[in-house]
Amino acid sequence: MARKEFRYRGYTLEELQEMPLDDVIKLFPSRQRRSLKRGFLPRQKKVLEKIRKIKKEGKTEGRPPVIRTHCRDMIVLPEMVGMTFGIHNGKEFVEVKIQPEMIGCYFGEFAPTRKKVEHGDPGMGATRFSMFVPLK
């Protein structure tokens, strides 16, 4: 079975990439749209400059370089599709390859800051029952 072609609000990825940014912003949900209408923050502009520099140099073929960023509030734009970002989760950089389905989401959604706690087995003396367990 053939894979279904990706569409965002009725537009293909190629159409989204050719559209001016103002038209793409109109397609986003209200929270993202309002955030982008206010303009990009300096750290977001820096990420966009890095993206455009890499695309201009033609390093997008093969395995493009990883763009490391602490900017978790950056919104995924169509021009970012296919690139790899190292998004900081507070401890380390989580590598995320941007897929078309991620358009309109925040970077922070793909690098969770907390992980599930996995407790080990209780040790000796951890419970009252352990008094009756013979030591090995």
From Swiss-Prot:
Covalent S-S links between cysteines: none
Keyword Secreted: no
Protein name per UniProt: Small ribosomal subunit protein uS19
Gene name for this UniProt entry: rps19
Family of this protein: Belongs to the universal ribosomal protein uS19 family.
Function: Protein S19 forms a complex with S13 that binds strongly to the 16S ribosomal RNA.
InterPro entries listed in its UniProt record: Ribosomal_uS19, Ribosomal_uS19_CS, Ribosomal_uS19_euk/arc, Ribosomal_uS19_SF
GO molecular function (one): structural constituent of ribosome
Assigned GO CC terms: cytosolic small ribosomal subunit
Sorted UniProt keywords: Ribonucleoprotein, Ribosomal protein, RNA-binding, rRNA-binding
GO BP annotations listed: ribosomal small subunit assembly; translation
The keyword rRNA-binding belongs to this UniProt entry's keyword annotation: yes
